[in-house]
Swiss-Prot record:
Protein name: Cleavage stimulation factor subunit 3
Coiled coil: none
Organism whose genome encodes this protein: Homo sapiens
UniProt function note: One of the multiple factors required for polyadenylation and 3'-end cleavage of mammalian pre-mRNAs.
Gene Ontology biological-process entries: co-transcriptional mRNA 3'-end processing, cleavage and polyadenylation pathway; RNA 3'-end processing
GO cellular component terms listed in the entry, alphabetical order: mRNA cleavage stimulating factor complex; nucleoplasm; nucleus
Spans of repeat HAT: 45-77, 79-110, 117-152, 163-196, 221-261, 271-303, 319-352, 354-387, 458-494
Residues that bear N-acetylserine: S2
Length: 717
């Protein structure tokens, strides 16, 4: 029993690093470092135990070919071929990753070799792969493998032999006009193949394809350049807004734009569209969480569909039109299930195709997601229903929105304005606003929308009554009423007399007495300001403690802004705002003006030199200024090396003998004494003297203790 318990404990043991990784993934499911730890752990476990981790991995990163390949290879290693084929069915069509497709071909080649129909299945697999991934810049090996496979197929009889030659030639000719790395080698192999079949026909066959090959080779060079630097194995994660990510996004868009520019210079719009969409598919493997890529891909398909329809190619036009809808469907079904932007674009696209039932299903599908705010969805849904089916259909959607407890006040505003502008019925709009006021009377944004509507109708009495109702009913908290009071004052300033203006100002001051105590002048600004014109300068407004509640509301980028009283002024100049982080004093910066050919010992850029030690400063003051010295400049390193090697005499007598030539005792480390006469003679020689001629005529033999030669010999050793 104890042994069984120990076995269970061992089976349940989880390494500490795995626990930490799991904790990180709870906080951020896209933490790649944590996933790397789990992947390494799974690779060291039996597949039955690791399968759960792999399933989580591909569920989190469904577009990552690298992760799918890891999962499939683990199943292949365990010989679970039935599971392998199911995995390929799940990912192969959706993930156009070159390594994943090579893994698929390798799997078919290794596991189907003993079947009677192996040759047919393998040929179908290669054709399928080239159709899907043949435009890949790294697809050369697949083309070569297919050709070698066809060459190796046994052909009995002349008919079968001709069939094989035709099949090989067809693949060669397709590959030689497809831009990719190593296209030159494929072309050379094709030339040899044709010459091996019939040298007389080969020349014409090659000439017929030569122009297209040269064009493809040129494009392949550009293709390789534009793809350089792209991280194509990166898993797709939500936008991180990092410089590295921005750089990758920019590079991907340049690649797509390059494909759109038609580098092959072909007139086949279908081929252009297929190449551009292949670029989009490659991009979406890495940037699948970026809605703009999905939208641009669908837009491009829609444009291509219209272009083909104009040319009369209705079949491909319909194909691309349906594929555009499929792009939207894939986006909202996989990585961007809650992205309203793509749902709305998808709905508009189907509306343009007059498929109204499909549009209804799209909106209802989004509304069925429980953990979203459906307000904007209902608003767009109402607008669609009114456009496509009339005002009555829009009212039905509004009724449905009122019954949904998740909706907010914006739905009432939209419905009221829709009634006013579309049915021209002010009374219906007024009733909707009144109905909403009962429910959202404590939300200043809704009250302001109602006020704007009444102001638009120029109904002064009703507007004034609304102001009084809202401000005196007690439904609106005082801390939220700041903008309502400001709008009331602006309203009276536009249409009321001075007495009514002063009355509103007094009531407003009473409502915010604690805030504006001692700052009565700040309230005076609101009486005279108009739009962005103020009766004081920005610094004066700041000194008054003035705050503009309308600007404060616009500046607050939050879903439900709350305008709370504050003694801190909101209106500030950019100059008055202090940075939130320390900044250098740019006035003290030295312009970057590097010296041209700076002499040794000086910095190429002025400034940045360390202060001179005090003792050296005293010495420098005693020396003549630098302008007095015109050269020659001493090589300091060599001079210091000579000083280091010199042996200084210990006594005065020894020094005198060396100077007077009494004894040649000037020595260098390990080199013995030096001939002093030669040194002195060389030292006193006149500069104008023709030393080269004298040395050639007389001093043929070098000195016995030549320092220079001794040093050179020492270096050689």
């Amino acid at each position: 029993m104890s042994g069984d318990g120990a076995t269970e404990q061992a089976a349940e043991y989880v390494p500490e690093k795995v626990k930490k990784a799991e904790k990180k993934l709870e906080e951020n499911p896209y933490d790649l470092d944590a996933w790397s730890i789990l992947i390494r752990e799974a690779q060291n476990q039996p597949i039955d135990k690791a399968r759960k981790t792999y399933e989580r991995l591909v569920a989190q990163f469904p577009s990552s070919g690298r992760f799918w390949k890891l999962y499939i290879e683990a199943e292949i290693k365990a010989k679970n071929y039935d599971k392998v084929e199911k995995l390929f069915q799940r990912c192969l069509m959706k993930v156009l990753h070159i390594d994943l497709w090579k893994c698929y071909l390798s799997y078919v080649r290794e596991t189907k070799g003993k079947l009677p129909s192996y040759k047919e299945k393998m040929a179908q697999a290669y054709d399928f792969a080239l159709d899907k991934i043949g435009m890949e810049i790294m697809s050369y090996q697949i083309w070569v493998d297919y050709i070698n496979f066809l060459k190796g197929v046994e052909a009995v009889g002349s008919y079968a032999e001709n069939q094989r030659i035709t099949a090989v030639r067809r693949v060669y000719q397709r590959g030689c006009v497809n831009p990719m790395i190593n296209i030159e080698q494929l072309w050379r192999d094709y030339n040899k193949y044709e010459e091996g079949i019939n040298i007389h026909l080969a020349k014409k066959m090659i000439e017929d394809r030569s122009r297209d090959y040269m064009n493809a080779r040129r494009v392949a060079k550009e293709y390789e350049t534009v793809m350089k630097g792209l991280d194509r194995n990166a898993p797709s994660v939500p936008p991180q807004n990092t410089p590295q990510e921005a750089q990758q996004v920019d590079m991907w868009k340049k690649y797509i734009q390059w494909e759109k520019s038609n580098p092959l210079r072909t007139e086949d719009q279908t081929l252009i569209t297929k190449r551009v969409m292949f670029a989009y598919e490659q991009c979406l493997l890495v940037l699948g969480h970026h809605p703009d890529i999905w939208y641009e891909a669908a837009q491009y398909l829609e444009q291509s569909s219209k272009l083909l329809a104009e040319k009369g190619d209705m079949n491909n036009a319909k194909l691309f039109s349906d594929e555009a809808a499929n792009i939207y469907e894939r986006a909202i079904s996989t990585l961007l299930k809650k992205n309203m932007l793509l749902y709305f674009a998808y709905a508009d696209y189907e509306e343009s195709r007059m498929k109204y039932e499909k549009v209804h299903s799209i909106y209802n599908r989004l509304l069925a997601i429980e953990d979203i705010d459906p307000t904007l969805v209902y608003i767009q849904y109402m607008k669609f229903a009114r456009r496509a089916e009339g005002i009555k259909s829009g009212r039905m959607i509004f009724k449905k929105a009122r019954e949904d407890t998740r909706t907010r006040h914006h739905v009432y505003v939209t419905a009221a304005l829709m009634e006013y502008y579309c049915s021209k019925d002010k009374s219906v709009a007024f009733k909707i606003f009144e109905l909403g006021l009962k429910k959202y009377g404590d939300i200043p944004e809704y009250v302001l929308a109602y006020i704007d509507y009444l102001s638009h109708l120029n109904e002064d009495n009703n507007t004034r009554v609304l102001f009084e109702r809202v401000l005196t009913s007690g439904s609106l908290p005082p801390e939220k009423s700041g903008e309502i009071w400001a709008r009331f004052l602006a309203f009276e300033s536009n249409i009321g007399d001075l007495a009514s203006i002063l009355k509103v100002e007094k009531r407003r001051f009473t409502a915010f007495k604690e805030e504006y105590e001692g700052k009565e002048t700040a309230l005076l600004v609101d009486r005279y300001k108009f739009m962005d014109l103020y009766p004081c300068s920005a610094s004066e407004l700041k000194a008054l403690g003035y705050k503009d509640v309308s600007r404060a509301k616009l500046a607050a980028i939050i879903p439900d802004p709350v305008v709370a009283p504050s003694i801190v002024p909101v209106l500030k100049d950019e100059v008055d705002r202090k940075p939130e982080y320390p900044k250098p004093d740019t006035q003290q910066m030295i312009p970057f003006q590097p010296r041209h050919l700076a002499p040794p010992g000086l910095h190429p850029v002025p400034g940045g030199v360390f202060p001179v030690p005090p003792a050296a400063v005293v010495l420098m003051k005693l020396l003549p200024p630098p302008i007095c010295f015109q050269g020659p400049f001493v090589q300091v390193d060599e001079l210091m090396e000579i000083f280091r090697r010199c042996k200084i005499p210990n006594t005065v007598e020894e020094a005198v003998r060396i100077i007077t030539g009494g004894a040649p005792e000037l020595a260098v480390e390990g080199n013995g004494p030096v001939e002093s006469n030669a040194v002195l003679t060389k030292a006193v020689k006149r500069p104008n003297e023709d030393s080269d001629e004298d040395e050639e005529k007389g001093a043929v033999v070098p000195p016995v203790h030549d320092i220079y030669r001794a040093r050179q010999q020492k270096r050689i050793r």
